[in-house]
Amino acid sequence: MPRRREVPKREILPDPKFGSVDLSKFMNVIMESGKKAVAERIIYGALEQVEKKAGKDPMEIFLTALNNVKPMVEVKSRRVGGANYQVPVEVRPIRRMALAMRWLKESARKRSEKSMAQRLANELMEACEGRGGAMKKRDEVHRMAEANKAFSHFRF
């Protein structure tokens, strides 16, 4: 982290098909080894499948799934007097979005369907309904924060 000046945020261009910056960011999260075309094919394929299965606007389902998975609080380790405490802190909006995208990707990868597009489509559908691996991860993080509420006075 530089001390001299604030590092400017990179401008991320919206994706060509839906015109969404969030979808573009998600594409960058899915992308491996700079293969953006592959990530694009996976995401657009998944959204196509979501549209077929749900019969609703795929972007609406994608955004609902993201909002459902976003964590509100998380725990951070804080050392006080020789002991480490898990202190619950509120998650900043940018990190909130990044964590949600990362968790969606990870839980889609762990699924057993054949193609990544199928896995992602099913994970998005489940997250939209409030279940699935990503939702489980979010609930786990919230549970940890709730369990350590007593240490919230050690805030940073």
From Swiss-Prot:
Keywords: Ribonucleoprotein, Ribosomal protein, RNA-binding, rRNA-binding, tRNA-binding
Cited function: One of the primary rRNA binding proteins, it binds directly to 16S rRNA where it nucleates assembly of the head domain of the 30S subunit. Is located at the subunit interface close to the decoding center, probably blocks exit of the E-site tRNA.
NCBIfam families: rpsG_bact
Family, as annotated: Belongs to the universal ribosomal protein uS7 family.
KW rRNA-binding (keyword) present: yes
Gene Ontology BP terms: translation
Gene3D superfamilies: Ribosomal protein S7 domain
GO cellular component: small ribosomal subunit
Name of the protein: Small ribosomal subunit protein uS7
Gene: rpsG
GO molecular function annotations of the record: rRNA binding; structural constituent of ribosome; tRNA binding
Oligomeric form and interacting partners: Part of the 30S ribosomal subunit. Contacts proteins S9 and S11.
Keyword match tRNA-binding: yes
Organism annotation: Leptothrix cholodnii (strain ATCC 51168 / LMG 8142 / SP-6)
Stored Pfam families: Ribosomal_S7
